[in-house]
Regions:
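Bacterial N-terminal signal peptides that target proteins for export
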Residues: 1-10
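Sec-dependent signal peptide cleavage junction
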Residues: 18-30
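Bacterial N-terminal signal peptides
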Residues: 10-19
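A surface/extracellular/periplasmic glyco- and lipid-processing/surface-interacting theme
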Residues: 27-68, 73-320
Length: 320
């Protein structure tokens, strides 16, 4: 009886603690990229998606733990999607890698990068990096073409089958992000956001539980499930945009988006905006996002990070 009474007291104390808003953080085995369960210790793979109109709809982008929207040549954007907790059966359409991808990947240990190809100069940089190249030249049996579309917008990857046999990609590590379902204090109500480039636009609307994302004014619907793209947290990360020595075969210059450094960051979660900062001191370190002089936690779930040019007086973005 004494043991039963003691257990009852402990249970009651737990209920009292919970009623006072104890942290509802990510599970101990959670992904360092989303806070979702099951990612700790598993491999991490970046998949390069095209993001022009002919590339869409995307396959299983909504299952990525985190994805970046990056400017490329001609004012277009591409998507660098990080998969860790789940490796869907099919992803894509896969497109070519860019120099900004390598700087993102330097914070991991032997991460995979799945992409359709790259020019000779960038291919040499990929081979010299610590990233594990998973292009069709490296893993040809897992790539195929969707014959209902034309190249280069139709190359798909059987990601889950590839990862079942993959031995070179390293396990994910902590990259500086924190997750908590409790809403931080000090936010300002925000129901919509947008960021734009000369030939591309991303926008979103708060839907009560997550953000609903559109590209070029059209709601994103998955090619497989038809589900909407609904990240829990959206970050507008203002980065240095530099000209690089890389470009496409048509003469377009590839911008280098510096994810190492520091700058402004607007974190959007739970229908609120937190105008703060980001810091990544070295290429090997992760990124810390802060608000009101403290690290800010993301909501548990998918994260979308949009690289915005921080070097112009009026960056093309809105938060309302």
């Amino acid at each position: 009886m004494k043991n039963i009474k003691c257990l009852s007291v402990v249970f009651a104390l737990c209920l009292v603690a919970a009623s006072f808003g104890g942290a509802v953080s990510a599970d101990s085995d959670a992904s360092p990229l989303s806070g979702l369960p099951g990612g700790a210790g598993k491999p991490v793979v970046m998949v390069k998606y095209g993001n022009s109109k002919p590339d869409r709809p995307h396959y299983n982008l909504n299952q990525a733990d985190l994805f970046y929207v990056e400017e490329v040549e001609w004012g277009l954007t591409r998507i660098a999607a990080m998969f860790n907790t789940k490796f869907p059966s099919v992803v894509g359409p896969t497109r070519s890698a860019r120099i900004s991808d390598l700087e993102i990947l330097e914070q991991f240990t032997s991460p995979g990068i799945a992409y359709s190809g790259a020019n000779d100069v960038l291919l040499k940089a990929i081979r010299k990096s610590q990233s594990i190249s998973l292009s069709p030249s490296d893993r040809s049996s897992f790539y195929y073409r969707n014959l209902s579309k034309v190249a280069p917008y139709n190359q798909l990857l059987r990601l889950s089958s590839m990862m079942e046999k993959e031995t070179k990609v390293g396990p994910i590590k902590d990259v500086g992000l924190t997750f908590d379902r409790n809403v931080p204090a000090g936010g300002v109500a925000a129901k919509t956001f947008s960021a734009s480039w000369p030939s591309s636009k991303v926008s979103g609307t708060w839907g009560g539980k997550s953000w609903t994302v559109s590209f070029d004014g059209s709601l994103h619907r998955d090619a497989v499930s038809k589900a909407l793209l609904t990240p829990k947290t959206v970050v507008l990360q203002f980065v240095e945009r530099k000209e690089s020595k890389y470009g496409d075969r048509f003469g377009g210059k590839t911008p280098l988006l510096k994810s190492v450094g520091a700058g402004r960051a607007i974190v959007l979660r739970n229908g609120q905006s937190f105008d703060g900062s980001w810091s990544r001191p070295t290429s090997e370190s992760g990124t810390t996002f802060s608000f009101a002089n403290s690290q800010i936690a993301f909501d548990v779930g998918q994260v979308m990070i949009v690289f915005v040019d921080g070097g112009v007086k009026k960056p093309p973005f809105t938060v309302k």
